[in-house]
UniProtKB/Swiss-Prot annotation:
It catalyses: Hydrolysis of terminal non-reducing beta-D-fructofuranoside residues in beta-D-fructofuranosides. Its EC number is 3.2.1.26. PANTHER family: BETA-FRUCTOFURANOSIDASE, INSOLUBLE ISOENZYME CWINV1-RELATED. It comes from the Eukaryota. This is Acid beta-fructofuranosidase. It is a single-pass type II membrane protein. Glycans are attached at residues 144, 211, 276, 608. It comes from Solanum lycopersicum (Tomato). The chain crosses the membrane at residues 32-52. SUPFAM superfamilies: Arabinanase/levansucrase/invertase, Concanavalin A-like lectins/glucanases.
Length: 636
């Protein structure tokens, strides 16, 4: 389909004018800013039971140069090679092609091949959901970062489109990095993104659709005045990235946005104001800062309703609203968030609970999940969250299988009215369209130390809802419970038995349980003497292969009076997304089984507690594959 470049002179009454708009045409080359102009910018930037034996999990642990250093330091994405605590790479495993083929997911979004990382600029436009993503078109390892592009009618079935942006200008020649979309009231789309310049300086750039009437947004124009932002004095040239979606400021026609950075070891969110997205003013102070959290990247900032169950547009503010601040911590590759109050006039966000401040309190996901990004979906009035699920195997294994990383299933995000401290994340309702037939329903009484096989047609693609009722007499005896100060990550996994746990579900296991991934609850005695519930995912025996991540992930999760212990699991071959208590605590597992593959995968429920009986109620749906393929552009 031939498209024409959006012409502001003929559309001024409909769309926001962009200064110095290029003439019509497909991806026309932009004028390169002069060396003097670049120099000025750079000068400004300077200033169980017997079968579950106890095994310890493996632990994972600025000057210009001719080539960039490790991407975990300079590019703001995770180092790929999995390393142990000594820093040495693990020995590669002799993967068969059948094993590697089985690892590829059936209903999670991923490109046909090669490397992918952060989700970028998600939006809804003219009947289509758009997802852009960091992509290497040349290899299954990080490099040559380009913006991949895909569209969907339902967030589940996807169609690949041509690249939206490639690194072809001096200001993004070393990578078209992460960015966000802002949709103006008149429909114009402003896409701000970070570019890595020919001198390895992180700058912010503007792009916009060539033709807003095109539902697929096939062609994008880079503003010829790029970069629109360079690192301000006091900010490192490699510590200035990932602009957020903008929100309306206190003055009419004013927009605000935040960009992550650091000052020393303090993570900060800088705030800029603009009226046209081509010129910006850095506001005094910062939106928020937390000492000791290091570089903040992929910052997200959005409102949530404390009264209603719908999502809110990014600019919404007023009574009954809290604001979520999320930062992806470059130092440990974890996504942290906090809920607080935003003072628009003072440009300050304050956490409701300083002990749960951003970077030191709650995490969006306690597993392999990073660089998340939300957007407001006007079609269904919801806030939708994307996140990157990376790899923990070796680069050689990724090169052998020809791809690396997937995106999480999109999640809705709501404020948890019951706790007032947590968000509730839940898979978008469209995932249920993949359910095949009626669920398998089981109710199982589990005595201490017991395990039971649940027979399903295929254990590789499942949607599981499970609730557990613990013997009330045992719960009342919590004063006798052990493991005060229990932690999932240091507990020894599901093989570590206590009076009131662990109990839960075992997924992607083989018949002999030589490979298994338990997802479970563990009730311990808190520091106040009351029951404290933990939600964990144990990967210590998820694979017999060396050189892959085998941590125990998890955290505490509030279980309120009258609530059963409940979980939902989405199993998709080598990915398990686990949601506890309606999504208060979430864990994403990336596993690499060698035996529990194809028809050998099994599903179990278990109770490895020593002093409590548990009744498990389970619903299991088999899921069919999503349709993810190239868009038939020749049919347009």
């Amino acid at each position: 389909m031939a498209t024409q470049c959006y012409d502001p002179e003929n559309s001024a009454s409909r769309y926001t004018l962009l200064p110095d708009q290029p003439d019509s045409g497909h991806r026309k080359s932009l004028k390169i800013i002069s060396g003097i102009f670049l120099s000025v910018f750079l000068l400004l930037s300077v200033a169980f039971f017997p079968i579950l034996n106890n095994q310890s999990p493996d632990l994972q642990i600025d000057s210009r140069s001719p080539a960039p250093p490790s991407r975990g330091v300079s590019q703001g994405v995770s180092d790929k090679t999995f390393r142990d605590v000594a820093g040495a790479s693990h020995v590669s495993y002799a993967w068969s092609n059948a094993m590697l083929s089985w690892q590829r997911t059936a209903y999670h979004f991923q490109p046909q091949k090669n490397w992918m990382n952060d989700p970028n600029g998600p939006l809804y436009h003219k009947g289509w959901y758009h997802l852009f993503y960091q992509y290497n078109p040349d290899s299954a390892i990080w490099g040559n970062i380009t913006w991949g592009h895909a569209v969907s009618k339902d967030l589940i079935h996807w169609l690949y489109l041509p690249f939206a942006m490639v690194p072809d200008q001096w200001y993004d020649i070393n990578g078209v990095w992460t960015g966000s979309a802002t949709i103006l009231p008149d429909g114009q789309i402003m896409m701000l993104y970070t570019g890595d310049t020919d001198d390895y300086v992180q700058v912010q750039n503007l792009a916009y659709p060539a033709n807003l009437s095109d539902p697929l947004l096939l062609d994008w124009v880079k503003f010829k005045g790029n970069p629109v932002l360079v690192p301000p004095p006091g900010i490192g040239v490699k510590d200035f990235r990932d602009p957020t979606t903008a929100w309306t400021g206190p003055q009419n026609g004013q927009w605000l946005l935040t960009i992550g950075s650091k000052i020393g070891k303090t993570g900060v969110a800088l705030v800029y104001e603009t009226s046209n997205f081509t010129s910006f003013k850095l506001l005094d102070g910062v939106l928020h800062a937390v000492p000791g959290t290091g570089m903040w990247e992929c910052v997200d900032f959005y409102p949530v309703s404390t009264k209603k169950t719908n999502g809110l547009d990014t600019s919404y503010n007023g009574p009954g609203v809290k604001h979520v601040l999320k930062a992806s911590l470059d130092d440990n590759k974890q996504d942290h968030y906090a809920i607080g109050t935003y003072d628009l006039g003072k440009n300050k966000w304050t956490p409701d609970n300083p002990e749960l401040d951003c970077g030191i309190g709650l995490r969006l996901d306690y597993g392999k999940y990073y660089a998340s990004k939300t957007f407001y979906d006007p079609k269904k009035e919801r806030r939708v969250l994307w996140g990157w699920i990376g790899e923990t195997d070796s680069e050689s294994a990724d090169l052998q299988k020809g791809w690396a990383s997937v995106q999480s299933i999109p999640r809705t995000v709501l404020y948890d009215k019951k706790t007032g401290t947590h968000l509730l994340q839940w898979p978008v309702e469209e995932i249920e369209s993949l359910r095949v037939g009626d669920p398998t329903v089981k109710q199982v009484d589990l005595q201490p130390g017991s395990i039971e096989l649940l027979r399903v047609d295929s254990a590789a693609e499942l949607d599981i809802e499970a609730s557990f009722e613990v013997d009330k007499v045992a719960l009342q005896g919590i004063i006798e419970a052990d493991h005060v100060g229990f932690s999932c990550s240091t507990s020894g996994g599901a093989a570590s038995r206590g009076i009131l746990g662990p109990f839960g579900v075992i997924v992607i296991a083989d018949q002999t349980l030589s490979e298994l991934t338990p997802v479970y609850f563990y009730i311990s005695k808190g520091a106040d003497g009351r029951a404290e519930t933990h939600f964990c995912a144990d990967q210590t025996r998820s694979s017999e292969a060396p050189g892959v991540g085998k941590q125990v992930y998890g955290s505490s999760v509030p279980v309120l009076d009258g609530e059963k212990h409940s979980m939902r699991l989405l199993v998709d071959h080598s990915i398990v997304e686990s949601f506890a208590q309606g999504g208060r605590t979430v864990i994403t597992s990336r596993i690499y089984p060698t035996k529990a593959v194809n028809g050998a995968a099994r599903l179990f429920v278990f109770n490895n507690a020593t002093g409590a009986s548990v009744t498990a109620s389970v619903k299991i749906w088999s899921l069919e594959s999503a349709n993810i393929q190239s868009f038939p552009l020749q049919d347009l």
